[in-house]
Regions:
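Short beta-strand/loop motif that positions the catalytic acidic residue
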Residues: 185, 191-193, 197
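Short alpha-helix in the alpha/beta-hydrolase fold that links the catalytic acid
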Residues: 77, 201-212
Length: 271
């Protein structure tokens, strides 16, 4: 069955949770935890957010950061998800302390992290295991969303057949040397991209559509006309000015993509 929709406008790993570095309270009920963990001997630092007053277990959502690294924006997305009723884990794909302040550093971190797809999958799966085992989480209900670099990561996890209920990519690269295979893609996929995103050319958009259609994947792709790269991040305009980058925040695209994401989660987790 082809469940495609298009709207235009197991890798070896060694995981150990080493230490919860800090915990805090963002609101009366929201708890946050900075979690240090190891994958194949390397240390990573993630951020868990959840409502500890909510009854029972709930779905978990992984948040994969932009190419800058695990930053405040990623943590804010985890907090937004917690406020919406989920337990969210903003994972770390680069390693503790690797947070770029300059595009050259971001590019170097990303290149090192993605040099081996087995390494990418191991780091993702370690975070997935951490989230699924959290006391507040129903481990059978897990989604993942990513931004820019993170958007490409979550799409590749879907291509690789990782057990996820939903995947959401925001302004992420859509092309990949990994290709989806028929019957292998498990999650429902939402892709939100900017029609004027110079980092995601139109051939990537059409290529993803064909790839997922051929694989029988459940894809919803929304392209916002005139919208540029990094449209979800309010800090994009400052970065664009500082480094002369073709990126820009777009309030309406950010709002509509977030609303679409919440509708997706409500739907896939309703059982």
């Amino acid at each position: 069955m082809n469940r495609y929709r298009h709207a235009l406008a197991a890798t070896p790993l060694s995981l150990a949770v080493v230490l919860t570095l800090a915990s805090g309270q963002v609101t009366a009920d929201m708890q946050t935890e900075t979690v240090e963990y190891t994958v194949n001997g390397e240390t990573f630092t993630g951020y868990m957010a959840y409502d500890d007053e909510a009854e029972g277990k709930r779905p978990g959502v992984l948040v994969v950061h932009e190419w800058w690294g695990h930053n405040e924006f990623a943590r804010e997305q985890a907090e937004k998800l917690a406020a919406a009723g989920y337990t969210a884990f903003a994972l770390d794909m680069y390693g503790s302390g690797k947070l770029a302040e300059h595009p050259e550093d971001a590019q170097a971190f990303m290149k090192e992290a993605t040099k081996d797809i087995d390494q990418v999958k191991a780091r993702f799966m370690a975070a997935r295991e951490l989230l699924a085992k959290h006391d507040s989480v129903d481990g059978s209900k897990i989604a993942a969303q990513g931004y820019c670099f993170g958007g490409a990561v979550v799409l590749n996890m879907a291509r690789l057949g990782v057990d996820l209920d939903a995947v959401v990519s925001y302004h992420g690269a859509l092309g990949s040397p990994i290709k989806a295979e028929a019957g292998k893609v498990q999650p429902r996929i939402h892709v939100y991209t900017g029609g004027a995103d110079k980092m995601v050319p139109s051939d990537q958009v059409s290529g993803l559509v064909k790839e997922m259609q051929d694989a029988g994947a459940d894809l919803t792709l929304v392209s916002f006309p005139g919208v540029m790269h990094s449209f979800t991040n309010p800090g994009a305009d400052k970065v664009a000015e500082e480094f002369n980058m073709p990126i820009a925040y777009d309030e309406q695209a950010a709002k509509r993509s977030w609303e679409g994401t919440l509708r997706l989660y409500e739907d896939v987790f309703s059982d």
